[in-house]
C-alpha cells in the first residue's frame, strides 16, 4: 500500500487574510496620508515600518497586525479606532454598491 503524499503549504495564489478588508484599510491609510501631504517613506519611518511593507499595506497585499495598526495610526496622528471606523465605512460603501449593481442586473 502506497503512502499518499499531501502537499505542504497553502495553494498557489491563496492568502492568509481576507482581501477586501486589507484593500479597504490600505485605501484609508493612503487617503489619510495623502490628505496630510505625507510621503509614504516618511509615514513608514514614523511608524517604524519598512517603506516597501507600507506599500504592501496600502495596496492591500498585506494585512497589518494590531501593533502595526496602532503604530500607523499614531504616525498619522489618529487613533486606531478612527482608522478602523473609516475602513468599515469603505467596506459598507462597497457592499452597498455591489447590492445596487446586483439589483439593477436582475
Feature locations, PLM:
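Residues that mark the N-terminal boundary/hinge immediately upstream of a DNA-recognition element
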Residues: 28, 39, 65-68, 79
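Short C-terminal boundary/hinge segments that cap the last helix of small helical domains
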Residues: 77-93
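N-terminal flexible/basic segments that precede or flank functional cores
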Residues: 1-31, 35-36, 41, 74, ...
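DNA-binding alpha-helical recognition surfaces that contact promoter or target DNA
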Residues: 27, 31, 45, 56, ...
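Short alpha-helical DNA-recognition segment
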Residues: 37-56
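Hydrophobic micro-packing sites on short alpha-helices
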Residues: 68-73, 83-84
Amino acid at each position: 500500500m502506497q503512502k499518499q503524499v499531501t502537499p505542504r503549504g497553502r495553494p498557489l495564489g491563496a492568502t492568509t487574510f481576507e482581501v477586501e478588508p486589507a484593500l479597504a484599510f490600505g485605501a484609508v491609510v493612503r487617503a489619510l496620508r495623502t490628505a496630510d501631504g505625507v510621503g509614504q517613506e516618511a509615514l513608514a519611518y514614523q511608524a517604524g515600518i519598512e517603506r516597501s511593507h507600507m506599500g504592501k499595506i496600502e495596496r492591500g497585499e498585506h494585512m497589518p497586525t494590531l501593533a502595526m495598526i496602532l503604530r500607523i495610526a499614531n504616525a498619522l496622528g489618529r487613533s486606531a479606532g478612527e482608522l478602523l471606523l473609516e475602513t468599515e465605512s469603505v467596506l459598507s460603501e462597497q457592499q452597498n454598491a455591489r447590492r445596487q449593481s446586483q439589483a439593477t442586473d436582475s
